[in-house]
Amino acid sequence: MAEQTYSWAYSLVDSSQVSTFLISILLIVYGSFRSLNMDFENQDKEKDSNSSSGSFNGNSTNNSIQTIDSTQALFLPIGASVSLLVMFFFFDSVQVVFTICTAVLATIAFAFLLLPMCQYLTRPCSPQNKISFGCCGRFTAAELLSFSLSVMLVLIWVLTGHWLLMDALAMGLCVAMIAFVRLPSLKVSCLLLSGLLIYDVFWVFFSAYIFNSNVMVKVATQPADNPLDVLSRKLHLGPNVGRDVPRLSLPGKLVFPSSTGSHFSMLGIGDIVMPGLLLCFVLRYDNYKKQASGDSCGAPGPANISGRMQKVSYFHCTLIGYFVGLLTATVASRIHRAAQPALLYLVPFTLLPLLTMAYLKGDLRRMWSEPFHSKSSSSRFLEV
């Protein structure tokens, strides 16, 4: 009886839960530092391009980076709700198109994930000169290698439907979204995460009362028809051509099998990406403070704040909050034996410590509205 009562405690050390914790944290940390490195590279390119004209614009950004403003933060949960309803009611009609679009995006994202490794492998034997492909653009050998490997992985996933390949593609999507999407201020971060918390709670806890089914869980776990199977049926290629391929579980989540093989743990990529955007923001702000004369950047903190407290980075504080929130969400799901809206736990455990620390350090006003308004220096070192 006691073993059954505390079975949730034993499940926390199961391989599936440990893998979920480690991978989600590693993806957030890696994606945040990829984002920071992209900022450094963009600054260097701007300096090089403007050195001949004698001017430098410190506020320019890369066109490939998408910054979320307040309006987008408010309407993103509404758009996500509409997309969720479309997938719930019309999944059979849109599943093939959605699967193909997801495969294309996953290919690009996983190529981005592999790019640093491919650059390391090709550096000794290949110069960084770009090869022209006409209207398709110019690419380095590392970019071509990473894209080729990504295409191969997606093709194998389509043929096998293996969960490990799906996880790899989901990891690429997580890292790419954290690296290319930016939160400009703490105000936008609070608007976005608060709206998504309400979105997550509503669709997990209350959608069953309206639609007689848990919309979030059904959409997240519903497999899609394999495009090869659909193509073989449309072209009447016969029963033995393309009919033995499996249905595909789309890479909108990370799944890991338990040590007993009896079940899979699941974590949606939104529960990694959205807190990851906040972690990316605070990492950039930590670096900004180091560039702008260290601790003198923000308004002076209260006199009772110790020097050790002043040295604690916002990134460390928020990352610990993410871990505690994810742990709490896991415990809640095990105790109640039902799906839980992870953002219900992740948002308070990340935002509240961050807001408290920013207030105590005297940085809250700056972080709230204009955290990066001044010209940054060329310092490239951050202790984490």
Swiss-Prot record:
On modification after translation, the UniProt record reads: Not glycosylated.
The entry summarizes how activity is regulated as: Its proteolytic activity is blocked by a signal peptide peptidase (SPP) inhibitor, (ZLL)2-ketone (ZLL) or a gamma-secretase inhibitor, LY411,575. However, is not inhibited by ZLL and LY411,575 for activity on simian foamy virus envelope glycoprotein gp130.
Q: What is this protein called?
A: Signal peptide peptidase-like 3
Assembly and partners are described as: Monomer. Homodimer. Interacts with STIM1 (via the transmembrane region and the SOAR/CAD domain); the interaction promotes the binding of STIM1 to ORAI1. Interacts with the simian foamy virus envelope glycoprotein gp130 and its processed leader peptide gp18LP; preferentially interacts with the envelope glycoprotein gp130.
Report if keyword Nucleotide-binding is assigned. Answer: no
Main enzyme class: hydrolase
Name the tissues where it is expressed. Widely expressed. Expressed in the brain.
- Predominant location of this chain? endoplasmic reticulum
